[in-house]
Structure formats: structure tokens, C-alpha cells
Amino acid sequence: MNLSTRHEPISELFNYPSSSHEWTDYALSSEQLQDFDENGFLPGIRILDPTQLEQLKAELDKVIDPEHPGHSLFYEFHLNEAEEENRVLFHALGAWQLEPALHDLPWSPALQMAAYQLLGGAVRLFHDQLFVKPPEHGGIVAWHQDYSYWTWTEPMAHLSCWIPLDDARVENGCLQYIPGSHRWGLLPITGLTGDMNAASATLDDRQRKALETPFAAEVPAGVGVFHHPLTLHGSTENLSSRPRRAIVINLVRDGVRSNADILADKETHNFPILPQGTTLSGQYYPLLFQPDSELGERRTEIPLAENSAAPSTDQV
């Protein structure tokens, strides 16, 4: 069954707030929002507890098998996207369609509330990603900006939440960020694998200097890191004896549209590209959080990011 037809939680992975008051328990503080505005990322948001982690790891083990009955539903599936010799980087998109817990992860209350505050409006799923770096030979993900791959959607009103399924440390290839790089503007695509520092060729001297002092998002399993679509980020090899598995949930503010005309002659794999000018909605872009219905009058009590990952309301 293709679970993308189900636009509500289908398992008991999460306990959902039953009132607007309970939603406020998940709200980010003004200080956290300020950190996001300043740095372009925000670590330390608990998304999954140990039981939920085990459910997701079990489902990841199932869907990574190309013989999984739902395999054809993946938007992309790369058993090894690494370019380096003797390195492995599993990467896939679209797993939310295949298994119940993977389907329900975007409906995490903590994820939904943070996304609303950081995007400044109603939230839709854009797409998910799975990353696996096996022990001792996990490959890199080079420095990049997410939106450089997403310019087929506009305006820029996007957000990502990176959720490790294993404790993430430098030695097993945790995500790393360049603080403040979300203010550098849109950079050219220089590749996701191969040369970790390929993006440096597109930077000025000050920006190249900033690459020398990245912030390593060392977080426990289940603790998410949110980042802006222009924040430069990447991850080094996993040379440890432990795996580094992670799920990324990519989100958009409701109202983002397709700019698919720029994709002419470009490989889009099995991604559900909508016609030019069409608002992202329908089967593959479910509405996750509607602040008016979930928060009601309490909406005014919830702080929003001043320089959010989305443009102002009149631009969307």
C-alpha cells in the first residue's frame, strides 16, 4: 500500500496534543529562535524517545533492502552514492510512503511546532531523506546548501530537520554547519559527494576562512537539528566502529509553488514534480500543521523567528 494517500498519523508512534494548551509545551523559546536567526541552525530538539528510535531503526532496516515490496515508491534510491574508494553512503528519498513509523515521523508534535515557529505559517511535508554511513567506511556529504537543489520550488520558504538514529559524534560523521552562512546568498551546486571542500571554489576569502571552524552538531540519537535552506552544511567520513543512521524531514511553508520549468533536461528520478505554478499540495505534499486549527487564540502566545526560513506572508 502506498501510504502517501494517508494524510494523518496511522500508528501510535506519537502521543498528540489534545488541546491548544498542550501544543504550547512543545514551543521553542525566544532565545532558541534568536539562535536560529543568528546561526542558521538550531540543535538540541528532542524528537524521538528510545522506543520510537527502535521502531524507526527496524523499519529502516526493512526499506533499505531493494527487495522491499514498496521499493518502486522511492523518489530516489542509492545503495552507495559515495565517490571515494572504499566508502559507502546510502541515500534515499520517499521512505514515508513505505512503512507506518517512517510515514508518521513528519507528524511529530515537536517537529511540527518548531517548524511552524521557524517558518512562520502552516507547514507541509516537502520530502524525507534516509542516510546511512556504515561503520569504518561511511562516506562524506560535501558542503552544500539545500535550496540550491530546490530552486524548482518558489519562493524560498523551506526548512530541514536532521534526526540521527544513532548518537552523532564527529568520529562517526555527525552533521556540521558553518554558522551564519545562511546570509551568504544562493551558491552554485558543487556536488554532494566526492570533494568535501568543493564548495570553497565558489566562496570569497572570508567565507573560505569560515569553513575552517565549522560547528559539529554532536547530539544524542533522537535529538534533531533544524537548519535554514541556505545554511552551508555537510558531514565527514564515519571511521568509527558504530553506524551513523539519520532521517531528514524537509518541510515547506504552505503556499510554496512549483517552478518546474527550470528542470528541463534535468534528471528528476521518481520525484513527484508538479506542473509550473502549481502550489505544493495533494497526495505527495500533505499539510502537517495548521496553526489556526491547532492553536486557536493561543497562536498569539507562540513566538516566531524574526528572520524565519520563510519570506513574509505577502510573498507566499
Q: Residue locations for each model-derived region?
A:
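Short, solvent-exposed loop/turn segments at secondary-structure junctions
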Residues: 49-50, 131-133, 148, 168, ...
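Conserved hydrophobic/aromatic beta-strand scaffold that supports enzyme active sites
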Residues: 25, 41-43, 160-164, 214-216, ...
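Short helix-to-loop capping/linker segments positioned immediately adjacent to catalytic or ligand/cofactor-binding
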Residues: 100, 113-114, 148-151, 163-166, ...
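Double-stranded beta-helix
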Residues: 12, 16, 168-232, 256
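Non-heme Fe(II)-dependent double-stranded beta-helix
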Residues: 2-39, 45-143, 149-152, 190, ...
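Short, conserved beta-strand element in jelly-roll/cupin
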Residues: 151-170, 218-219, 250-253
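Non-heme Fe(II)/2-oxoglutarate
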Residues: 2-22, 66, 72, 192, ...
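Short, surface-exposed loop/helix-turn segments at secondary-structure junctions
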Residues: 145-146, 195-211, 243, 262-269
